[in-house]
């Protein structure tokens, strides 16, 4: 028979939420809809804190914003601090997620930053010409064939892409400034550059070099209870129905990581 001693304090509870992979709405991507149940659960049990383990090269700015906003809202509503621990990378949208935390911790070799916006595509017009293929397009609306990969790139298209990127970039910058505040260095941190480990700390993009378990023990006691929370794979996913989409998502994530030499 077990007896509970009521006056002994319970160990601090810290749910651990892993945010790994590209950010987007594919079956493998990190999305607000997919993560919402886990994020809500993390803040539900009156924890001492919530820990985010981040390993993401980025992705959708909208999903990054929605996920970060949900974390911030619950943190404020429940009065629960959030700590982010960056593993290999928190770049672009991955760093957007990290900034949802009150404090960001990194490894000596973690890559952080890439506070910018990118648009990439391919041009097939020369290949089509060599193969004798003619492109035929009929549109209603002069912008309907905007950035068509089968036509030569137009200066007007480049200008429009930059006009679309600018407000997204400004929103990203505003989020970083709001979350990091006076901790940021006075140099240009918003040119999409990246920094490693202690460099990121020195620039105010992170708060220190630390790993999950020892840092949580230092902050919340040796008996802190770290509770991993993970996404459950659906039946269709387990049966391999989404295999093609999963493979494409993996290729996309590897391409994003390759951009940072990973």
Regions found by a protein language model. Give the residues of each.
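Short glycine/proline-centered loop/turn elements that form peptide/ligand docking sites
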Residues: 111
């Amino acid at each position: 028979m077990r007896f509970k001693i009521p006056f002994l304090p319970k160990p601090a509870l810290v749910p651990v939420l892993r945010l790994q992979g590209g950010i987007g709405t594919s079956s493998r991507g990190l999305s607000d809809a997919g993560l919402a149940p886990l994020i809500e659960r993390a803040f539900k049990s009156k924890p001492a804190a919530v820990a985010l383990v981040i390993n993401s090269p980025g992705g959708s700015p909208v999903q990054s914003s929605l996920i970060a906003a949900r974390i911030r809202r619950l943190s404020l509503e429940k009065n629960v601090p959030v700590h982010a621990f960056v593993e290999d990378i928190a770049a672009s949208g991955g760093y957007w997620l990290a900034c949802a935390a009150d404090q960001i911790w990194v490894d000596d070799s973690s890559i952080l930053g890439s506070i910018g916006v990118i648009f990439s595509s391919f041009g097939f017009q020369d290949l089509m010409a060599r193969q004798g293929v003619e492109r035929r397009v009929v549109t209603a609306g002069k912008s309907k064939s905007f950035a068509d990969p089968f036509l030569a790139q137009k200066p007007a298209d480049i200008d429009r892409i930059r006009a679309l990127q600018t407000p997204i970039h400004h929103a990203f910058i505003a989020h970083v400034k709001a979350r990091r505040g006076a901790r940021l260095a006075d140099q240009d941190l918003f040119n999409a550059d990246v920094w490693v480990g202690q460099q990121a700390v020195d620039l105010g993009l992170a708060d220190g070099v630390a790993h999950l378990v020892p840092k949580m023990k230092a902050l919340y006691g040796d008996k802190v209870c770290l509770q991993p929370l993970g996404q459950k794979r659906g039946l269709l996913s387990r049966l391999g129905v989404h295999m093609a989409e999963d493979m494409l998502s993996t290729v996309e994530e590897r391409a994003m990581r390759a951009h940072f030499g990973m």
